[in-house]
UniProtKB/Swiss-Prot annotation:
Protein name per Swiss-Prot or TrEMBL: Protein Smaug homolog 2
Family membership noted in the UniProt record: Belongs to the SMAUG family.
Organism lineage string: Eukaryota, Metazoa, Chordata, Craniata, Vertebrata
Chain segments carrying region Disordered: 158-301, 407-471, 607-643
Gene3D superfamilies linked: Smaug, PHAT domain, Transcription Factor, Ets-1
Start-end of Polar residues biased regions: 215-224, 624-643
Modified residues (Phosphoserine): S172, S271, S278, S279, S281, S555, S557, S563, S592, S600, S628
Pfam families according to UniProt: SAM_1 (PF00536)
Length: 694
């Protein structure tokens, strides 16, 4: 199908929609354009409206609180018409005029629900208000409840009147009712139609919240009456029949407080069925999709549904779908109570939101734990829990702070170029990090570069502090510290797998910047390189070692692994205690002479009889890739034999003559082969007595 044909089809649909539907659809499409496209469209619209004096006059009226307040003296038809034509022109930030609109909107919606009149117009007004940039979180939450009341009113069939047609451009004769309260045509033409009622009773002069409503709502802020008005409607447990009313009379404050909502008592508050996003009508589906922050790029809310599901709070997703990230982070129990969230649920939501606010301090604590020898597996589990929570890009979350602090971070390197390993040692001293955590000057993308294989003491600059609220940068910093420990400590397959999974999630997460993702990618490549240093067969044998870990020496593996005499080995063991399956008993028996202490032969490289410091660093940069394979040399010693575990030290000693032969393993380079050979000869040269003590 040609492009012009597609445009023709879209134009045909567009002509069939009413003005409100067209507006919602256009806004939904505009949210998908780039900034350049949006600016171009703005220029086109401004140019076309430059000579349109009528729209300027209408906009002036729409933003005058005094004029809007005078509409209360008009007929209901006139008020609905004025709201539809002026509400879209309200300027964001005009709180005084907005309050007047909300007061009128409250009265229109209450009357519409009570009398089954102006249903379609009420839907359109709700649509405009829900997508309007001038409305706040409280406004939208209250309006979403009004919309659910309106649709429940139609679905419940409380009265026998037929449901009106969806398009407001159809004739008003379809709006049944003894009082003949139908509106005219939708759009600006309503202003030209005279009211069908010759007489009317004006609005009640009270513009404040009725006492009956004030007694129920828990929100002390009564600037916007509609914020708490749905509460009495929702809490009502019985259907109170309405008293006969003069056709032109708006409901009094007492009636508004006493009348019940048209819903069943067992209907759960804020259920997905009553949300805007799950509405059954076409127009509200469009509106729901345009207002659903779960689907907006850069909103930070895309992970909220899965996060709520993990908390078993997914039934309240509709409440969060109308919020921005910043609004969600400021939720309180009092606000949730005003939205009729049950006591247990609002307490759980409030606690979960509080945990979201504490993520940065948790990440700082994790960073210190990793540096000071904490359990790496526990740290990775904490990171897994944090990455599934809603995270917003810091540059979007605090754009002004980010713009002011972009310059100090230029030292991190040019974007798009992953830093060279060793450019800045990532293994920071705990004291240094403690000093920087006490300060919170704003910064952007403050995370360490890819970890160096062997950090050099004394040459390490103090890491830049991470700004408050910059979760992606803090998360990336911890990932850098974890990568360092993975490279210099005894390898653990589960830890490495968990780390790679975390990196994959970060690489596809919208909150992380391109620079952060490139650094994470460089760390991923280093960890993958670590895994590739072992033969494939050794990796396959790992499962056999796990199953047979108790055959020869059982639980002796951990005490032996902890009896390291070398300082580096002690630090490594203290940082990351290995599980019982960490070292295969047979291989530990081969590597337990006095100079090694029963641990990985890579620790033996610190011995003066072996290679120099440079070769030691090379070895530490390329350790093994699983927790049952502490070094490459062990795999080369055992690789040519099919027995995964030897049952006695005597059986172990039968194999050393073949150890120097690397076999057909092409993955081990000659340098590592020579290291394996010299290490094995050194271990066997101490005799068999100490070997048999395992």
């Amino acid at each position: 199908m040609m492009f012009r044909d597609q445009v023709g089809i879209l134009a045909g649909w567009f002509k069939g929609w009413n003005e409100c539907e067209q507006t919602v659809a256009l806004l939904s499409l505009l949210k998908r354009v780039t900034r350049t496209q949006a600016r171009f469209l703005q220029l086109c619209l401004e140019h076309s409206l430059a000579d349109c004096n009528d729209i300027h006059l209408l906009e002036s009226e729409a933003n005058s609180a005094a004029i809007v307040s005078q509409w209360q003296q008009e007929s209901k038809e006139k008020v609905v018409s004025l709201l539809l034509s002026h509400l879209p022109l309200l300027q964001p930030g005009n709180t005084e005029a907005k309050s007047e609109y909300m007061r009128l909107l409250q009265k229109v919606l209450a009357y519409s629900i009570e009398s089954n009149a102006f249903i379609e117009e009420s839907r359109q007004l709700l649509s405009y208000a829900l997508i309007h940039p001038a409305t706040t979180l409280e406004d939208r939450n209250a309006l979403a409840l009004w919309l659910s009341h309106l649709e429940e009113r139609l679905a419940s069939g409380f009265r026998s009147r037929p449901e009106p047609s969806y398009h407001s451009r159809q004739g008003s004769d379809e709006w049944g009712g003894p009082a003949e309260l139908g509106p005219g045509e939708a759009g600006p033409g309503w202003q030209d139609k005279p009211p069908r009622e010759n007489g009317h009773v004006p609005f009640h002069p009270s513009s404040s919240v009725p006492p009956a409503i004030n007694s129920i709502g828990s929100n002390a802020n009564t600037g916007l009456p509609c914020q708490i008005h749905p509460s009495p409607l929702k809490r009502s447990m019985s259907l109170i029949p309405t008293s006969p009313q003069v056709p032109g009379e708006w409901p009094s404050p007492e009636e508004l407080g006493a009348r019940a909502a048209f819903t069943t008592p067992d209907h759960a508050p804020l259920s997905p069925q009553s949300s805007v996003a799950s509405s059954g009508s076409e127009q509200t589906e469009e509106q729901g999709s345009s207002r659903n922050t779960f689907q907006e790029d850069g909103s930070g809310m895309k992970d909220v549904p899965s996060w709520l599901k993990s908390l078993r709070l997914h039934k309240y997703a509709a409440l969060f779908s109308q919020m921005s990230y910043e609004e969600m982070m400021t939720l309180t129990e009092q606000h949730l109570e005003s939205q009729n969230v049950t006591k247990g649920a609002r307490h759980k939501i409030a606690l979960s939101i509080q945990k979201l606010r504490e993520r940065q301090s948790v990440l700082k604590s994790l960073e210190k734990d990793v540096l000071e020898g904490g359990n790496l597996r526990n740290a990775l589990q904490e990171l897994q829990q944090i990455i599934i929570t809603p995270i917003k890009a810091y540059s979007v979350l605090q754009a002004t702070v980010a713009a002011a602090t972009t310059t100090p971070t230029a030292k991190d390197g040019a974007p798009g170029e992953p830093p060279l390993p060793g450019a800045e040692p990532p293994l920071a001293h705990p004291g240094t990090d403690k000093g920087t955590e006490a300060k919170d000057p704003p910064a952007v993308e403050n995370y360490p570069p890819p970890p160096a294989p062997a950090p050099t003491d004394g040459s390490e600059p103090a890491p830049a502090p991470v700004a408050d609220g910059d979760i992606p940068s803090q998360f990336t910093r911890v990932m850098g510290k974890v990568c360092t420990q993975l490279l210099v400590s005894r390898p653990d397959e589960e830890n490495i797998t968990s780390y790679l999974q975390l990196i994959e999630k970060c690489l596809t997460h919208e909150a992380f910047t391109e620079t952060q993702k490139k650094r994470l990618l460089s760390w991923k490549q280093q960890v993958l390189k670590l895994l590739r240093t072992f033969p494939r067969k050794a990796a396959l044998e790992m499962q056999n070692y796990r199953q047979q870990k108790g055959w020869a020496f059982g639980s002796n593996s951990l005490p032996i692994a902890g009896s390291v005499g070398m300082g580096v080995a002690r630090r490594t063991q203290r940082q990351f205690p290995m599980p019982p399956r960490a070292l295969p008993p047979g291989r530990m028996g081969l590597l337990s002479p006095s100079g090694i202490g029963g641990v990985s032969p890579r620790h033996a490289l610190t011995s003066p009889s072996l290679g120099g410091q440079g070769r030691q660093n090379l070895w530490f940069a390329n350790p093994g890739g699983s927790n049952s394979m502490p070094s490459q040399s062990r795999s080369s010693v055992q690789r040519t034999h099919s027995l995964p575990v030897h049952s006695s030290p005597q059986a172990i000693l039968m194999f050393p003559p073949d150890c120097p032969v690397p076999g057909p393993d092409l993955e081990i380079n000659p340098t590592l082969e020579s290291l394996c050979l010299s290490m094995t000869e050194h271990a066997l040269g101490d005799g068999t007595d100490k070997t048999s003590t395992i």
